[in-house]
Amino acid sequence: MSEMDVLVVGSGGREHAIAIGLAQSKSVSSVHCLPGNAGTSFIAKNHDISLLNLDAVVNLAEELEISLVVVGPEVPLVDGLADKLRDKSIPCFGPNSEGAMLEGSKLHAKQVMSDLGIPTGRFEVLERTSRIEDIFDSFKPPWVIKRDVLAGGKGVVVTSSKPDARSAIESWIALDGFVIIEEHLAGEEASVLVILDESGY
């Protein structure tokens, strides 16, 4: 197998860990990070380009003749970075924009689970603050209130306090036009990552 030049898109600890692993691989000749961080500068070549400038990311990958692009953050994936790279025949580890919407939109994810019969908590979309009391009656506390945006882990409130729940609902409806109210499911939480290609996983 020929050695690869790899571009890691992102600037967080996740991307730093990926860059370390790639730098240690005998199959990788060079690692580039965009934009990277202070830590990645010791093991890779950082490129001061915004990861939200998708065309600039693609242009850099072409210029460097990158063998593989690994995308960490969700936002550029939702915006279609993997699609743009594949359009240029540049291999990319990351879902297309449609697949990334499972992470990018909580409502889309709930609708997909509902359509496919995948068990998930009961939910309701709330668009009018006049229905807040109906929600309090329909869902038992603690109430799970979610924004339908990528919010860096800040888009969810779980509370048994009616004033706190009302405040979150009112402010997020004002921002986004609606919120998602979800049944609270108690228990352990686990994340499972599955890597797959056209032939399986």
Language-model segments: which ranges?
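Conserved ATP-binding module of the ATP-grasp superfamily
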Residues: 68, 119-121, 142-145, 158-191, ...
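A conserved helix-loop-beta module that forms one wall/lid of the active-site cleft
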Residues: 95-155
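Short acidic loop-to-helix transition motifs that present clustered carboxylates
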Residues: 53, 126-131, 164, 186-188
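Short, hinge-like loop/turn segments at secondary-structure boundaries
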Residues: 47-51, 87-89, 110-112, 139-140, ...
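ATP-binding N-terminal substructure of ATP-dependent carboxylate-amine bond-forming enzymes
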Residues: 1-98
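General beta-strand structural signal in soluble alpha/beta enzymes
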Residues: 8, 33-34, 70-71, 92-95, ...
